[in-house]
């Protein structure tokens, strides 16, 4: 697992991309975004210590939404293998 910093308005990932990581917010705020006919919509605003981006690791589909730093933000990248190992050892976290 590695920490990565993102500046205000920088995308962590974009809708439709393939997934290599889930993320845990260490500091800052992340907006979850989705494109629609009306433009980009903010679906949620997340803060530490929230995990996000895990659905694409679980189902193997492209990212269903984007994630953008709302302010200077630090996240921890979690690989698919690490995430799946954690879930197998902590099944209560999967609900």
Label every model-predicted segment.
Residues 1-33:
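Regulatory nucleotide-sensing modules
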Residues 11, 44-95:
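Cyclic-nucleotide recognition modules
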Residues 40-42:
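Short, mixed charged/polar active-site loops
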Residues 36-38:
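Solvent-exposed strand-loop boundary residues in beta-sheet-rich modules
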């Amino acid at each position: 697992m590695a920490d990565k910093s993102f500046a205000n308005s920088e995308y962590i990932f974009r809708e439709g991309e393939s997934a290599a990581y889930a993320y845990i917010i260490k500091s800052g705020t992340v907006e979850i975004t989705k494109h629609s006919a009306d433009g980009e919509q903010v679906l949620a605003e997340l803060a530490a210590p929230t995990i996000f981006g895990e659905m694409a690791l679980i189902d193997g589909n492209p990212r269903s939404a984007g994630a953008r730093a709302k302010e200077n933000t630090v996240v921890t990248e979690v690989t698919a293998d690490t995430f799946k190992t954690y879930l197998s050892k902590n099944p209560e976290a999967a609900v």
